[in-house]
Amino acid sequence: VAIVGDNIVYTSGDKLMRMNKETGVVDSVVGQRAGTNSYAIQPVTYADGMIFSAFNGGIQAFDADTLESLWVYKDSVGGQSVSPIYYNDGCIYTGFCNYGSGKNDQYVCIDVKDEDPDTTDEEKSPKWIFTNKSGFYWAGAYATDDFVVLGMENAKANTTDPARIVTLDKNSGSVIDTEYTVGGGVRSTISYDKDTDAYYFTSNGGYFYKATIDDEGNFTKLDSIALGGASTSTPTVLNGRAYVGVNGSGWGDYKGSAIAVIDLDSFEIAYKAETKGYPQTSG
């Protein structure tokens, strides 16, 4: 969901809907989506007066006031749309995944401008495309003024082989620099912390990472710490500590899953708060 003024905006099947956040009354105004999600995990994104909604193999933009469609992007390779739709400086960034297929799945940057206001199903073309075998599963980007930081799956979509973490030129999508995880794909969004001037993420191989990157987008250091279990959780960083979800030994209640709290100065796990189940969400 997204909060837009007094309303909660959400998807239901092939419809974009909204309800009053105070009363719960559903608005009679409904947006028509160009498709549905076979696996809907990411919420809609609200930015620049628009709502951006993912469907299988594509993204659709709606007017946030009228819920009328503005344009549609249909990815040429397709796949699950399970990566966050990230907005920055007039563009959205998102990826697609044909899990374990070995296809060169695509991560795209799309200028959100509605070039043809008279057409509601205008087909959008991406500003640039970056490809990766086995794609982008829950992986979200972070953009600076000059470059984009992004993680992804490894080619075999497993938890043991290293996966790439890249910096991309913000205007062209060309690779500036590349590093690799200890093991497993990156299924979190990249977090940036101003106090430490560093980027943080996790891998489903069970590691927490800290990357330092210079102004040109080159990696200067990549540190990692073992979490004791898989993590797809986007790090929340506050007051010198990072908080991430970690999987335990199974899917039953209280099997070792936890929220791990990492002290960033010592770069060690300060403690773990046990949870009933695996806090698996990317957010």
Predicted segments with their positions:
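Glycine-rich phosphate/oxyanion-binding loops and their immediately adjacent helices
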Residues: T202, T220-K221, G245-V246, I262-D265, ...
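Ankyrin-repeat and related helical/solenoid repeat scaffolds used for protein-protein interactions
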Residues: A260, D265-T275, Q280-G283
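Short loop/turn segments that connect beta-strands within beta-propeller blades
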Residues: N20-G24, D63-L67, D111-E115, L168-G173, ...
